[in-house]
């Protein structure tokens, strides 16, 4: 089991790397995260949803994602509550105290999934959540040491040296663990190191002498590693000598599946930027309104920061606008939440750029789809994760067809598009069509390079590169005895 001294210490990345190393060695390996709090999710082979990080880890193992890999998924929709998903299906929206009371049952779900995976695979690499030293969350813990003790897992503790204070993080974490929990830790991994390793060695020697626990390895700071973030919006972009199209998206308070933008963020000729709500909106070819776990709430925040006027000005100057999932719902005239699924029950005015209304329903739509665009000869594959049903004249001009079923909407002038599909930019052919729609096709030289850009192949190459680094920098002789 990989646990971290903090959130974003590198747990997801290390698990993916370990999984790919073992997969390359012929081991039947699977990832597992007992409890995940994240707004980025993926549709599974058994028709549920799990955190996207576990879907990437499944790919590292050569597997399709399955709900047993992440039996408890928490998707925050307010500051004090979240949608609770058990074995891929929505249980309920629960406030924090109500979920705390539910934890014993959640633990049963976690252990049931764990047992099924144990029966199918030779090795399971488990990912913890946050930090194991959260004193207020120790009771009924199912995410970190509580699970490790129940499943009798050895633990690797990973810490991020790039943010500073790595030795304090490690020693402080150990000080807050019980004796039995400390004994589970078989070694430390220092993550995101840049510089001369010789200058770090005295600290590593002190750490091992002080704690009696070995340092299993020091992983370098890996730039341009194209793996989807578990939750935090990734704002760093690779160096791009020449870009021909600018795309922006606002950072919504409850943004979900912002990993839709990763392919654009990494595209060599697209200048993609996430824009904070209070920042000036730069001139752009395309504005994308991303998904949201609280559509009405995020819509109100967008309006309060003047984004209606900002987007209207963008449209007046000929820019394109796209809404994905919750962002699609915002483009309509009204959004109704009669059951209070995402906050207080009621209705809100949308931006009104598409003539449609959306009603949030208790049933969640989860499926992988393949369709054909209506404005280009291109096949689109993606997945749906939403709880809304939209209706209105705008849907009579669909954005794509999934078999005989119409999906999404495209305005009469072709300037505004909306869809429930996530993963729109992951495939080269579809990406070319979307970017041509946004203005890319007007640049002849762009046609020579865009078809060769394949985000899925880039992710696979990143997993291989990550595995190479993990294999090179970790003490596999010591690790092998625990696998």
UniProtKB/Swiss-Prot annotation:
Cysteine disulfide links: none
GO biological process: cobalamin biosynthetic process
Keyword Transmembrane helix set for record: no
Active site: 325 (nucleophile), 422
Pathway: Cofactor biosynthesis; adenosylcobalamin biosynthesis
Example GO molecular function: catalytic activity
Superkingdom assignment: Bacteria
InterPro entries reported in the protein's UniProt record: Class_I_gatase-like, CobQ/CobB/MinD/ParA_Nub-bd_dom, CobQ_GATase1, CobQ_N, CobQ_synth, GATase_3, P-loop_NTPase
UniProt domain GATase cobBQ-type: residue ranges: 244-430
Name assigned to this protein: Cobyric acid synthase
């Amino acid at each position: 089991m990989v646990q971290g001294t903090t959130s974003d210490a590198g747990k997801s990345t290390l698990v993916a790397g370990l999984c790919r190393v073992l997969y390359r060695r012929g081991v039947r390996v699977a990832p597992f995260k007992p409890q995940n709090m994240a707004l980025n999710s993926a549709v599974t082979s058994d028709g549920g949803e799990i955190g996207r990080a576990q879907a990437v880890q499944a790919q590292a193992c050569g597997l399709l994602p399955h709900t047993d890999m992440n039996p408890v998924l928490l998707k925050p929709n307010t500051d004090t509550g979240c949608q609770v998903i058990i074995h891929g299906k929505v249980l309920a929206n629960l406030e924090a105290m109500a979920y705390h009371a539910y934890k014993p049952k959640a633990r049963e779900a976690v252990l049931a999934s764990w047992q099924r995976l144990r029966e199918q695979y030779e090795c399971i690499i488990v990912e913890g959540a946050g930090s194991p030293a959260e004193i207020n969350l120790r009771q009924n813990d199912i995410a970190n040491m509580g699970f490790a003790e129940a499943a009798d897992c050895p633990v690797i503790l990973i810490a991020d040296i790039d943010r500073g204070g790595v030795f304090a993080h490690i020693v402080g974490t150990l000080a807050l663990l019980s004796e039995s929990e400390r004994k589970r830790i078989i070694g430390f991994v220092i993550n995101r190191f840049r510089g001369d390793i010789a200058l770090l060695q005295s600290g590593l020697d002190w750490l091992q002498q002080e704690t009696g626990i070995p340092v299993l390895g020091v992983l370098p700071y890996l730039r341009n590693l194209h793996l989807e973030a578990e939750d935090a919006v990734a704002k760093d972009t690779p160096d791009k000598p020449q870009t021909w199209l600018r795309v922006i998206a606002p950072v919504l308070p409850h943004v979900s599946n912002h990993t839709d933008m990763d392919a654009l963020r990494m595209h060599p000729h697209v200048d993609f930027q996430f824009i904070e709500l209070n920042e000036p909106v730069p001139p752009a070819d395309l504005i994308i309104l991303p998904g949201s776990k609280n559509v009405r709430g995020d819509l109100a925040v967008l309006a309060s920061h003047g984004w209606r006027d900002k987007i209207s000005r963008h449209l007046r100057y000929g820019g394109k606008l796209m809404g994905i999932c919750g962002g699609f719902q915002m483009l309509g005239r009204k959004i109704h939440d009669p059951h209070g699924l995402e906050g207080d029950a009621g209705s809100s005015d949308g931006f009104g750029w598409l003539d449609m209304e959306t009603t949030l329903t208790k049933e969640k739509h989860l499926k992988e789809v393949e369709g054909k665009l209506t404005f280009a000869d291109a096949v689109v594959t993606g997945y749906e994760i939403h709880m809304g049903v939209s209706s209105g004249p705008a849907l009579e001009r669909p954005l794509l067809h999934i078999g005989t079923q119409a999906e999404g909407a495209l305005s009469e002038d072709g300037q505004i598009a909306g869809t429930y599909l996530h993963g729109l930019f992951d495939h080269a052919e579809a990406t070319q069509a979307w970017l041509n729609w946004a203005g890319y096709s007007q640049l002849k030289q762009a046609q020579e390079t865009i078809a060769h850009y394949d985000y899925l192949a880039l992710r696979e190459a990143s997993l291989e590169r990550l595995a190479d680094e993990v294999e090179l920098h970790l003490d596999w002789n010591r690790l092998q005895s625990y696998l």
